[in-house]
Every structure is written in structure tokens, then in C-alpha cells.
């Protein structure tokens, strides 16, 4: 029965590692170092989930266009009447922000076509010119509603799990979506040729299911915490590490083996993957921070990445200092 009990205990203890293989790498690294130093490992809870401000704090309502003077033959001919009537229908009123953004670009193109290609009365031209100006002014608001309040993007920006190496095939698509949104924000006013010819809805499904940005953010925080607690474990016990001529260097050799077999082979490649993924999403991170700031809010992923780089460098510097003290050739020491 005792054997069965301890086997079950080991099984339960290992479940967390199985469900979080990325976290398990850092746990194993930390545990092995603690074992070699003959000290208890530090306890570390899972990092807090990544969240964003409530939708009500970020959403901006825009007035609907009234048909009014648009009920003319010319405006029916140029397609504007039918486009707005469809938007004001029951189905059009419940469009999500991605579909609404497609509608806004179609509306701008249609308004431009009506103004440049069809004979209009003075009242019609005055009305359409005013609407055209308003819709260009409102475009950043519609973009903000996509980026910050759509269910798709709110899922993309939040997470409570580590970034998996299996996410590699999602990176290019998510990066492309952020690039397209950024290009829309930078579209000069009234430069119709700079509006996208594609539908933004095509990006929606992949963005919604991947949570890539949120997972990168969560992993940056989690990695920083694990590196910090592990560096402190090493620093606070470095007097235990004996090396030099005519000294028993068994413990140092064991530490070096842990460094080579776990840090170099497992931890460092994962850190590089996380950093590379963030770099590919950097334009999106900057865009999110900028737009959040305009609403008096903050996301925080850029600061999380800075902290991640700082904690990585601190950990590397400990090993470099230890190897120098113990006479290990610098070429064999870790690099940031």
C-alpha cells in the first residue's frame, strides 16, 4: 500500500508538468540546481492571467447615417442608398466590429465614387461631402473598436497559459493581421487608394482562436518570475560553490552539468523562441499600447518584454561570473 501511495503522489505531482510542459522546463531546471546546492527549491505560483480593461471603458459608439436626403435617384444609382439601407437593417445593426470595419471601407469607397463619378445636385454634393469627411474622421474609432473591443481581439490579447512551440505556424498570420491594422491607422485622410482592397473578416477566425499575443505576454511574465527566483537561489548560495585548484569541485561540476544539459539544451532555446515570437509581434504590441494609452488605459506587454530581457541578462551574468571565478573558458559560458 505504501508503494501505491507514493506512486500516486508522484503521479499527481507530475501532472502539472505534463499539462504545462513549458513551465515544467523551468521547474526542472530550478529543482536540479536546488538539489545540487542541497537547499530547498523556491515555491512559485502560476503567473496572473493576462486581462484587458472592460469593454465599456474602451468602446466608442458612433452615430448611424440617416437616409434623409439620400433617397434620390442618383444616390441609388451609385450604390450608396442600398449600402446604407442594408447597414441600417436588423442584420446590419448587429454586425461585429470586423464586419463593421469592412462596411466602413466599402462606404468610403462608395462615397468617393458617388462624389467623383455621378452628377449630383448641390444639396446632394454638400451632404455627401460632409458625410465623407465625417467617415474619414471616424475611421480610427472603428479601428479602435476592432482592436480593443471586438470579442476576437479580446480573446487574442488575453491568456492564462504558456506559449507553446506548436504555435510557430500561427505567428506569421497574427503578425500580418497587426500589420494590416497598423497600415489602416496610418492611411492618410481622403487617400482612397490606401484603403485595403481585402476583407478584414478573413483574419478574424485565426485571431480569435490563437490567443498568441496573450500567451506571449503571459509567458514573458512567467519566464521572468522563474529566472528571477532561480538567479536569487544561485546568488544566495554561491558561497557553497567551491572551485579552484586543490579543491573538491564535485558540486561545481554538477552545477555545470545542469547548466549544460538543461539551461543550454532546453531553457535557452525556449527563451529564444519566446523572444523571437515577441519581436515578430512587436508592431502589434506597440499599436495596442498606443491605442490603449489614448483611452487612459495600459496593456503592459512592452514593459513585460523589457523585464524578460532584464531577468534573462541577470541570469546569464551570474553564470558568466561563476565560470570566470572557477576558471572555465569564456567561450563555454552562456550568452544573453
Question: Where would I find each of the regions flagged by the language model?
Answer:
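Sec-dependent signal peptide recognition
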Residues: 1-7
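C-terminal motif of bacterial Sec signal peptides marking the signal peptidase cleavage site
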Residues: 12-14
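Sequence contexts marking disulfide-bonded cysteines in secreted/extracellular proteins
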Residues: 16, 79, 115, 242-244, ...
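N-terminal Sec/ER secretory leader and immediately downstream segment
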Residues: 19-166
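Extended amphipathic alpha-helical interaction segments
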Residues: 132-284
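Alpha-helical oligomerization segments
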Residues: 275-336
Amino acid at each position: 500500500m505504501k508503494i501505491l501511495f507514493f506512486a500516486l503522489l508522484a503521479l499527481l505531482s507530475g501532472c502539472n508538468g505534463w499539462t504545462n510542459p513549458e513551465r515544467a522546463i523551468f521547474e526542472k531546471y530550478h529543482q536540479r540546481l536546488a538539489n545540487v546546492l542541497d537547499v530547498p527549491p523556491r515555491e512559485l505560483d502560476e503567473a496572473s492571467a493576462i486581462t484587458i480593461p472592460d469593454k465599456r471603458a474602451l468602446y466608442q459608439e458612433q452615430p448611424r447615417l440617416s437616409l434623409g436626403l439620400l433617397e434620390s435617384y442618383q444616390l441609388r444609382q451609385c450604390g450608396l442608398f442600398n449600402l446604407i439601407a442594408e447597414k441600417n437593417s436588423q442584420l446590419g445593426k448587429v454586425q461585429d466590429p470586423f464586419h463593421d470595419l469592412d462596411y466602413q471601407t466599402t462606404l468610403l469607397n462608395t462615397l468617393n465614387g458617388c462624389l467623383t463619378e455621378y452628377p449630383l445636385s448641390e444639396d446632394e454634393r454638400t451632404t455627401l461631402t460632409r458625410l465623407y469627411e465625417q467617415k474619414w474622421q471616424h475611421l480610427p474609432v472603428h479601428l479602435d473598436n476592432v482592436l480593443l473591443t471586438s470579442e476576437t481581439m479580446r480573446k487574442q490579447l488575453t491568456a492564462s497559459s504558456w506559449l507553446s512551440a506548436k504555435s510557430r505556424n500561427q505567428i506569421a498570420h497574427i503578425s500580418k493581421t497587426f500589420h494590416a491594422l497598423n497600415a489602416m491607422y496610418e492611411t492618410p485622410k481622403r487617400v482612397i487608394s490606401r484603403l485595403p482592397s481585402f476583407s478584414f473578416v478573413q483574419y478574424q477566425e485565426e485571431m480569435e482562436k490563437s490567443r498568441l499575443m496573450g500567451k506571449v505576454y503571459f509567458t514573458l511574465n512567467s519566464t521572468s518570475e522563474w529566472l528571477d527566483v532561480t538567479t536569487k537561489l544561485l546568488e544566495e548560495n554561491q558561497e557553497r560553490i567551491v572551485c579552484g585548484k586543490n579543491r573538491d569541485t564535485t558540486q561545481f561540476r554538477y552545477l555545470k552539468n545542469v547548466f549544460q544539459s538543461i539551461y543550454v539544451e532546453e531553457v535557452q532555446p525556449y527563451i529564444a523562441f519566446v523572444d523571437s515570437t515577441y519581436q515578430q509581434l512587436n508592431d502589434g504590441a506597440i499599436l495596442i499600447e498606443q491605442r490603449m494609452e489614448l483611452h487612459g488605459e495600459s496593456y503592459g506587454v512592452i514593459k513585460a518584454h523589457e523585464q524578460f530581457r532584464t531577468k534573462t541578462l541577470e541570469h546569464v551574468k551570474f553564470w558568466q561570473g561563476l565560470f570566470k571565478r572557477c576558471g572555465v573558458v569564456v567561450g563555454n559560458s552562456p550568452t544573453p
